[in-house]
């Protein structure tokens, strides 16, 4: 039953949150039935004061409580169930990780099938799934792969731990072997900027290993590859109908963040060429200028701050992208939990970091990506990644 429970959970990581919750609940019920035990919910001791402070902050700024209470119930359910699951599996984390890597491969195979069908028929068969976003085209016959997830960016982040394991640690457990190239190909076709940044980092990593003693040679080769990548990937990264290229999106986002010190939203988002950088800048603006910047406005209140600062003040009623999740965990934590919450989250990442455990490092990569692009607290394995990160902080694992 433990193997079945693990497969249920790693499958849920790549599906929408309500399906993930159902699969997680099923896995926990299987384990409770098999072992006839329930662990004390110790994480609840941390959640209770957080929720009390959060609701108090919401009350002080005069916001409505409907969405905050909904978010509290959802996050609490995920945390309590994942705590039970990881307690049952605390001695079998490597087995669970192996299943996650293999499931990443299966999800990538679905992505390959999605791309092949689109190339042959022009139909994106995945767009009929619930919660799926619009199809993004790279050319008339090539689209951004999403597989079972809503966007290519979501898929790129969800398989990031697999990329780190396969191409930084080089698959020491021999989980995929040569099949790892399928994962890399699909990752590249998601056109997620994080995937391309990872490729540059991986290249630096391996180049340093081979030419570590020859710093000048290493520097010249790195510079040449970066320049080549910018020149060659830019036309490929440009979306056929909807987006500018990968490097344009990265550069435009940097420019938007650099203007964040301005107190006027119109100045912050002016000259933005890409929708993603405009959305990033807008939500970061909300995070910096919402009420109660020390403790935030409370969980689930970012849409209310967004409505007050963007819709009402600047009459920008057409800017509704990512209004619920804030585009990035950084924005949402800053908006809803203030600077104190943001500092506590960074402290959490530092406290549980374990460079001697490859699984810990792999999931840190995913959490860093979510910090910059992915503000939903429970979507696509967010809670799963945080629990894996915590439970692998106590021991070393390198093969």
Predicted features by range, described:
Residues 98-128, 140-141, 147-209:
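Alpha-helical transmembrane segments of multi-pass inner-membrane proteins
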Residues 173-176, 203-216, 314-316, 322, ...:
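Hydrophobic transmembrane alpha-helices and their immediate junctions
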């Amino acid at each position: 039953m433990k193997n079945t429970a693990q497969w249920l959970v790693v499958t849920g990581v790549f599906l929408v949150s309500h399906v993930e919750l159902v699969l997680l609940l099923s896995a926990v019920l299987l384990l409770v039935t098999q072992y006839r035990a329930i662990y004390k919910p110790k994480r609840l001791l941390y959640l209770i004061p957080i929720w009390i402070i959060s609701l108090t902050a919401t009350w002080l700024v005069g916001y409505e409580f409907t969405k905050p209470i909904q978010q509290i119930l959802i996050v609490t359910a995920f945390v309590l169930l994942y705590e039970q699951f990881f307690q049952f599996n605390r001695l079998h984390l490597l087995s669970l990780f192996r299943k996650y890597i293999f499931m990443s491969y299966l999800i990538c195979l679905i992505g390959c099938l999605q791309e092949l069908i689109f190339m042959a028929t022009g139909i994106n068969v995945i767009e009929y799934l619930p919660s799926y976003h619009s199809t993004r085209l790279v050319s008339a016959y090539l689209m951004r792969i999403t597989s079972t997830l809503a966007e290519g960016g979501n898929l790129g982040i969800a398989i990031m731990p697999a990329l780190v394991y396969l191409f930084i640690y080089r698959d020491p457990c021999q989980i995929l072997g040569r099949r790892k190239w399928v994962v890399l190909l699909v990752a590249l076709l998601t056109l997620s900027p994080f995937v391309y940044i990872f490729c540059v980092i991986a290249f630096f990593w391996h180049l340093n290993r081979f030419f570590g003693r020859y710093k000048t040679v290493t520097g010249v080769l790195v510079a040449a590859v970066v320049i080549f990548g910018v020149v060659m990937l830019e036309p490929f990264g440009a979306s056929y109908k909807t987006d500018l290229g990968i490097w344009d999106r990265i550069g435009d986002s940097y420019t938007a963040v650099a203007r964040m010190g301005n107190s006027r939203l119109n100045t912050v988002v002016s000259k933005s060429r890409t929708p993603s950088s405009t959305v990033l800048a807008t939500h970061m603006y909300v995070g910096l200028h919402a009420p109660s910047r020390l403790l935030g406005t409370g969980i689930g209140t970012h849409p209310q701050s967004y409505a007050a600062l963007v819709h009402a003040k600047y009459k920008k009623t057409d800017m509704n992208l990512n209004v619920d999740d804030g585009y990035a965990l950084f924005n949402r934590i800053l908006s809803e939990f203030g600077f104190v919450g943001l500092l506590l989250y960074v402290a959490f990442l530092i406290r549980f970091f374990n460079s001697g455990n490859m699984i810990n490092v792999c999931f840190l990569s995913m959490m860093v990506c979510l910090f910059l692009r992915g503000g939903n607290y429970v979507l696509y394995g967010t809670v799963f990644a945080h629990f894996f990160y915590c439970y692998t902080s106590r021991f070393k694992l390198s093969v």
